[in-house]
């Protein structure tokens, strides 16, 4: 079987920068000795958990250990997802990191095991080394002869380095490529001999005085030295899932962009595993074990946990990091209770990292970082009030009040958020504790699980209206 690999192009909008919940986190905030700093790279507090995550980080970077399960357990609003996001940022772009929620695998289009298999294989990278022949030089002259009848075009390309000069015959494809890239005499270009791809490297310094005015994107480079034809080693990094999709159907690479991958047959994956193992032995490829992060892992059922147990023992297995805020609770699909809602055999395979509640000073530091990220100017008194609210309710609720308070402050034409803005936002939007208290007080006015509601208490006056004339 001939395995095809193509680099997946990121089609996301790079210029679109939105402020998300964890957009202020750029790393784990560790020094060179893996010791956590009190506040660094957007991470605050949780020193023991961050130190443990630093050890996991080194395990992944070394690439020698895979197939390990890590459970991050702690109460709500203690930074479990933030810890995983910090780990993702510290790993960089070369190490695959796949994040998903526990409920994402339940789909009508894919089975649970297929969704988990795809997530596992997205987290395993393959670095494929390829030697390519390139022609690099400065364009001296381009001659293109076009037929009057609109037939085949012919042309000649004169290209040089500081040591030699050569003339190449051009066909239709190369002429179209040069026209598309708008290559002119004096440009320094690179041509891939295998596929005919033309890359414009810049403009030669010798032609810097040809024009009086040039665009801001014009880049001047030196004329290449030595031979025109050079061998260059290129490393392509793709995931096993991308190779699966490309080889699963005739136009499989299109599914990388549409997301319509469907069920991939196990025979295809087995052949790809065999081929990748051959490439690894021959030195053509290198396996990069990545990280699979499953948030709200207690939402998985017993069949999924059984699959994860088996998948962790596979040859191509990433490090699986799971997060949960459950205590002693039922495992989905069973009638028995277990710690964190996970079966005991998976807990036995996992190393567990615990997170603690934030202190008042740590909450204040986090809210200060969030206000800077959202470009909201808070007065010292407003920050103290938000810190107090965060300690009594939750950190999420307090951080959500920042943007709301800014809108209230803008309404009164103020550039900074004051205490009165925070108080008004606090009164307008209830937290979970006040909402639960309100429900208990007016429970009879709400519809219960059986569809019943006490109609006699829904109005302000419980007395019946007199309709007699």
From Swiss-Prot:
Keywords: Activator, ATP-binding, Chromatin regulator, DNA damage, DNA repair, Helicase, Hydrolase, Nucleotide-binding, Nucleus, rRNA processing, Transcription, Transcription regulation. The keyword ATP-binding applies. InterPro entries: AAA+_ATPase (IPR003593), P-loop_NTPase (IPR027417), RuvB-like (IPR027238), RuvB-like_C (IPR041048), RuvBL1/2_DNA/RNA_bd_dom (IPR042487), TIP49_P-loop (IPR010339). ATP binds at residues 74-81. GO terms for biological process: box C/D snoRNP assembly; chromatin remodeling; DNA repair; regulation of transcription by RNA polymerase II; rRNA processing. Gene3D superfamilies: 1.10.8.60, P-loop containing nucleotide triphosphate hydrolases, RuvB-like helicase, domain II. SMART domains: AAA. One of its GO terms (molecular function) is 3'-5' DNA helicase activity. It is found in: Nucleus. This is RuvB-like helicase 2. It comes from Eremothecium gossypii (strain ATCC 10895 / CBS 109.51 / FGSC 9923 / NRRL Y-1056). The gene is RVB2.
């Amino acid at each position: 079987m001939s395995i095809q690999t193509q680099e997946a192009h990121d089609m996301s909008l790079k210029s679109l920068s939105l402020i998300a919940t964890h957009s202020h986190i750029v790393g784990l905030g560790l020094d060179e000795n893996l010791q956590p700093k009190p506040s660094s790279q957007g991470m605050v507090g949780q020193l023991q958990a961050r130190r443990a995550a630093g050890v996991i980080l080194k395990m992944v970077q070394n690439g020698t250990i895979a197939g390990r399960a890590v459970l991050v357990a702690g109460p709500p609003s203690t930074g479990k997802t933030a810890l995983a996001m910090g780990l993702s940022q510290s790993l960089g772009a070369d190490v695959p990191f796949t994040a998903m929620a526990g409920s994402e695998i339940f789909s009508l289009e894919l089975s649970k095991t297929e969704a988990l298999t795809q997530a596992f294989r997205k987290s395993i990278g393959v670095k494929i080394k390829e030697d390519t022949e390139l022609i690099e030089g400065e364009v001296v002259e381009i001659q293109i002869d076009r037929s009057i009848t609109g037939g085949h075009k012919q042309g000649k390309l004169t290209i040089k380095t500081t040591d030699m000069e050569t003339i190449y015959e051009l066909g239709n494809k190369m002429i179209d490529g040069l026209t598309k890239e708008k290559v002119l005499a004096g440009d320094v270009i690179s041509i891939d001999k295998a596929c005919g791809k033309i890359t414009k490297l810049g403009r030669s310094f010798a032609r810097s005085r040809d024009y009086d005015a040039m665009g801001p994107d014009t880049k001047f480079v030196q004329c290449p030295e030595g031979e025109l034809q050079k061998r260059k080693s290129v490393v392509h990094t793709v995931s096993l899932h991308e190779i699966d999709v490309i080889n699963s159907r005739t136009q499989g690479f299109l599914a990388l962009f549409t997301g319509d991958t469907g069920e991939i047959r196990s025979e295809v994956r087995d052949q790809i595993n065999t081929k990748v193992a051959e490439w690894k032995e021959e030195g053509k490829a290198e396996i990069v074990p990545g990280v699979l992060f499953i948030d709200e892992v207690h939402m998985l059922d017993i069949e999924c946990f059984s699959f994860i147990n088996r998948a962790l023992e596979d040859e191509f297995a990433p490090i699986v990091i799971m997060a949960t805020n459950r205590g002693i609770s039922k495992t989905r699909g069973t009638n028995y209770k277990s710690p964190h809602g996970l079966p005991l055999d998976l807990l036995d395979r996992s190393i567990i990292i615990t997170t603690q509640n934030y202190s008042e000073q740590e909450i204040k530091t986090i809210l200060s970082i969030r206000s800077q990220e959202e470009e909201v100017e808070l007065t010292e008194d407003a920050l103290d009030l938000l810190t107090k609210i965060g300690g009594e309710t939750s950190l999420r609720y307090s951080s959500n009040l920042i943007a709301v308070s800014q809108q209230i402050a803008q309404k009164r034409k103020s550039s900074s958020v004051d205490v009165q803005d925070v108080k008004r936002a606090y009164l307008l939007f209830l937290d979970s504790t006040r909402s639960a208290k309100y429900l208990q007080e007016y429970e009879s006015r709400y519809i219960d699980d059986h569809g019943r509601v006490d109609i006699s208490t829904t109005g302000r006056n419980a007395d019946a209206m007199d309709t007699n004339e």
